[in-house]
A protein has these predicted regions:
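C-terminal motif of bacterial Sec signal peptides marking the signal peptidase cleavage site
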Residues: 11-13
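A short beta-strand-turn-helix
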Residues: 31-49
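Bacterial signal peptide processing site
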Residues: 15-17
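Typically the conserved alpha-helix immediately C-terminal to a functionally engaged Cys/Sec
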Residues: 62-78
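Short active-site neighborhood of thiol/selenol oxidoreductases, capturing the structured segment around
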Residues: 45-59, 119
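Thiol-based oxidoreductase modules, predominantly thioredoxin-like and allied folds used
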Residues: 31-32, 75-102
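Sec-dependent N-terminal signal peptides
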Residues: 1-9
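Non-catalytic, surface beta->alpha helical segment in thiol-disulfide oxidoreductase systems
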Residues: 68, 106-110, 114-160
Length: 160
């Protein structure tokens, strides 16, 4: 998995990002959509990356997460303190930033994600000698119906 993720990062680093590619819009403004941005934020803040795999226009449970969990003060406060939020969206609409489809497909393959919603927690370090990011998968989970249950499941993967 490490080498596949390293290949993703190398490919992503070669893709110029558009001005609007760093975060998603609407109800999930806290979610980054560019892996380079998520890695840099993770290293800077010394927090793991919470990767959220979704298909925002076809996944009913994902829509529920947006309204019932991600928009709650409880989830927002927990996420701000504990993780860097990164969304991998497989929307069929043409609303994804340039390069996102390739990045998202590579990430889903490397982590063997086949259903939505899926959450992966990743640890990221920056290797100064070669300038690359080193990613280590920590754990994963699926849908949980409340902020308390989702946070409880994710908290198992957070060190602090």
């Amino acid at each position: 998995i490490f080498f596949i993720l390293l290949a993703i990062l190398t490919l992503q680093a070669c893709n110029p990002k558009s001005a609007d590619s760093s975060t998603t819009s609407a109800s999930s403004q806290l979610w980054l959509v560019n892996m380079n941005d998520a890695q840099a934020q993770s290293v800077k803040d010394q927090k793991p990356i919470l990767v959220y795999f979704t298909s925002s226009d076809t996944c009913g449970l994902c829509e529920q997460l947006e309204t019932d969990i991600f928009s709650t003060p409880m989830f927002k406060e927990w996420a701000e303190k504990k993780v860097v939020l990164f969304k991998v969206d497989f929307s069929t609409l043409d609303q994804l930033p340039p390069g996102s489809q390739e990045q998202n497909t590579a990430m889903a393959r490397s982590l063997k994600v086949s259903t939505y919603p899926t959450f992966w927690m990743l640890s990221v370090t920056h290797e100064v000698e070669n300038g690359r990011f080193k990613i280590k998968p920590i754990g994963y989970t699926g849908y949980h119906p409340s902020p308390e249950k989702l946070i409880g499941a994710l908290q198992n993967f957070v060190r602090r």
